[in-house]
Regions:
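Iron-sulfur (Fe-S) cluster-binding modules
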Residues: 1-53, 65-69, 73-77
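Small-residue-enriched alpha-helical segments and adjacent helix-cap loops
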Residues: 25-28, 50-179
Length: 179
């Protein structure tokens, strides 16, 4: 799924790169930068000297290859602050210009999506971490989570949605994902 969307959203990257270069050159105010960068899952951090990027992993699904790519990115860009979020995304903080520009391209080359991870776009879909192995689950919802994410990604840049639209699935009678 992500590979298809990363190829689709690559066409938007020049807009992000231009805004990011202007932000670091102080030609774009933080609020103006946020208006562009937020849709790419990237935000200027307090003080306007660094940025944060949010990587989408639908339902918190991190495959072995994803973990290897994250490890390599951490080494390559000397990343010091990695945050695994409650929305089952991964964030890298305190990024300088060369780090964010290179990292963004590497993510898209590896099929890791950032588009729509912020701003007025559907956020990462969350789901219970134990789906597929939880003895109390009604059925494994993983494929439904992936299909729903694919559907919501199709709205990016096409339909105006409510701010921070969040979708979560659950697979048992409990409220494990806090839906």
């Amino acid at each position: 799924m992500n590979k298809r969307w990363t190829e689709h959203f690559k066409a938007d990257l020049p807009t992000f790169y231009d805004a990011t270069r202007k932000f670091y050159a102080k030609e774009l105010k933080p609020a103006e930068y946020k208006g562009v960068s937020g849709g790419f899952g990237c935000y200027g951090e307090r003080g306007g000297e660094t940025t944060m990027i949010r990587l989408r992993f639908t339902g918190g699904i991190l495959e072995r290859e994803d973990l290897i790519q994250l490890r390599e990115a951490i080494k390559k860009y000397n990343l010091k602050f990695v945050h695994f979020t409650t929305c089952q995304s991964v964030q890298f903080h305190h990024l300088k210009e060369n780090q964010i520009l290179g990292l963004m391209m590497d993510c898209y080359e590896q099929g890791i999506l950032t588009r729509g991870a912020g701003s007025d776009f559907p956020r990462n879909i969350t789901a219970p971490a134990l789906r597929g192995v939880d003895p109390l689950e009604y059925f494994d919802i993983t494929e439904l989570v992936k299909e729903a994410a694919d559907y919501l990604l199709s709205f990016i840049g096409v339909v105006e949605l409510p701010r921070k639209l969040k979708v979560s699935f659950k697979n048992t009678g409990t409220n494990a994902p806090h839906t």
